[in-house]
């Protein structure tokens, strides 16, 4: 659910000590292989000196837009051995800007008079974005919906009301069927 909601998460997973892994004990498993399908970034620290740098990198990876899952695997000895220094979290690149041609196409579609759904997700569900989406919907006739899974949706008095797209595919198709155009904002 964290991945669906684009929530930044750092998982720290314990592993056998580096010198014990070669013995292939009964509880030894391919943690990287297990973590990879559910993580955007996976790294195993090889020694105590790498833990702070790898940890800082895991934080930076999780902070990337739109929110990612980073898994850092720490063999036991990397966690209990001494390290000589810490690390600074690397800067995170700014999110990509929207292509101006895509914006022009959205404007064209919104002005077309054809049925348009504006599907909001992630930061599109925050107060400022909701306010803008409400204005766009009011002036264009677009209908607002939100994703079925969201980390946070700002609601309450004076906020724009949204209908969530159902999680069940058949129901979601029924909701989207009347629309000729779908514009994604954070979704």
Tell me what each language-model feature is.
Residues 1-187:
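N-terminal alpha/beta PP-like core and its mobile active-site loop of ThDP/TPP-dependent enzymes
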């Amino acid at each position: 659910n964290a991945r669906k909601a684009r929530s930044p998460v750092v998982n720290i997973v314990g592993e056998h000590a580096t010198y014990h892994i070669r013995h292939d004990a009964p509880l030894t498993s391919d943690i990287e292989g297990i973590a990879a399908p559910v993580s955007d970034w996976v790294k195993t620290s090889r020694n105590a000196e790498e833990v702070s740098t790898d940890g800082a990198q895991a934080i930076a990876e999780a902070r990337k837009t739109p929110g990612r899952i980073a898994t850092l695997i720490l063999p036991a000895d990397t966690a209990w051995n001494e390290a000589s220094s810490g690390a600074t979290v690397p800067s995170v690149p700014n999110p990509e800007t929207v292509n101006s041609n895509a914006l022009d196409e959205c404007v064209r579609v919104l002005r077309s008079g054809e049925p348009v759904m504006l599907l909001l997700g992630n930061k599109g569900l925050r107060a400022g974005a909701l306010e803008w989406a409400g204005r766009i919907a009011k002036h264009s006739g677009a209908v607002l919906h939100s994703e079925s899974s969201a980390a946070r949706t700002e609601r309450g008095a004076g906020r724009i009301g949204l209908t969530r797209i159902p999680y069940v595919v058949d129901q979601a198709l029924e909701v989207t069927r009347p629309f000729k155009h779908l514009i994604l904002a954070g979704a």
